[in-house]
Amino acid sequence: KELCIRTIQKNVVYLRPNADGVTAHKPAVQQNIVKSTVCAHSYYIIMYVRCAQTINLKTMAERIRIKDIAERAGVSVGTVDRVLHDRPNVSKPAREKVEQALKEMNYQPNMYASALAYNKAYTFYLLIPKHESEAYWEEIEEGARKCEDQRRDFHIDLEIRFYERSNEDSFKAVSEEILDAKPEGVIIVPSSLEVTRGFTDQLHQKGIPFILLDSYMPDLRPLSFYGQDSFCSGYFAAKMLMMLAGNEKEVMLMRQTKDGHVVSKQQDNREVGFRHYMHDHFPQIVINVLDLPLNGTRNEYQKMMAQYFDEHPATHHCITMTSKAHLVGDYLLKSNRRDVQIMGYDMVGKNAKCLREGSISFLIAQHAYMQGYYCVDTLFRAIVLKKKVNPVNYMPIELLMKENIDFYRRTQI
């Protein structure tokens, strides 16, 4: 079989099997087009391309220096430097000439090199609720720490602080500690709107940019937001659930509450989306609510669920808007109930275990690790690199089941 190879460089080596192994030799004459007859167990051809020689020379030739900009604009090098760094003492005509030259030359500053040369240390704070091991918040911490590690050359230091969920005084106390530390940027998982506003108003006054995580409150005017669209997520969850439960008379909605209220704005918005879909498409189906206390014990939860299913034997489908679907899943396994399907949120370890064992049918993943990573990275790009960032960043709504859970990449960025 005739083989034709167009070589980028004149580096063709023939490998020929022999009794001692494989020997290599170069042909005496090297051409840009090499023709050879290749037979089975006879000759092998390898082509080398040295990466160092494939550098785009045009890009190197087009590297723009401050001197080039000054010559193009007809001003001094010092004037160009002041414009690039937005310093004063530049006349309006000179600034316009430089800006026009930058535009014509398509100048792109090397922000990374400038930031490294500046050699300044930056402290960011992450304020999140206290949580137990393997929770959704732990994945956010992991992602945030990963970004901190990857940006260590820029002297980024991430401090994580915790507040008691549904305890406004705890949120206020920790937020005051953060303000006293005078950080360069803050990431906030909000408490109630008004309590969080008291914190963010002070951040605005001090010129400290902040990012909202998990719950979007546009009235607070954050630099950016990361999280799911909670309403759409709840709407989607209802639609998926009713593909299975369309012929049922009732479903169970499990919530986590404190003093009669759900413990997060996100959980509340998901429920609104869920009920909106049910009202529009399945108004005849009864939604039974089971409220589990936030600080309850596992034994208390087991008793409450046993009582619920004794009183509602017709319930065969459950949904929860939190990461605690495993509480119902564990109960179903222990009570050997195989006629109930559960849908919940978050790919935390306990939920994943129940999903694999079959006590949970579906999970909606919201990429907590990714949220934590990108919150820190967004502060880095906005504060250190002086780049514009997207104000709203919704996470994908991803449906997981037993058949595809092993393909979910929890730490993928």
Predicted regions and their residues:
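Flexible loop/hinge segments that line or gate small-molecule binding clefts
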Residues: 194-232, 348-356
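Hinge/cleft segment of the Venus flytrap/periplasmic-binding protein
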Residues: 101, 105, 261-262, 278, ...
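Amphipathic helical "hinge" segments at domain boundaries
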Residues: 110-172
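Hydrophobic alpha-helical segments within soluble ligand-binding/sensing domains
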Residues: 225-252, 301, 367-384
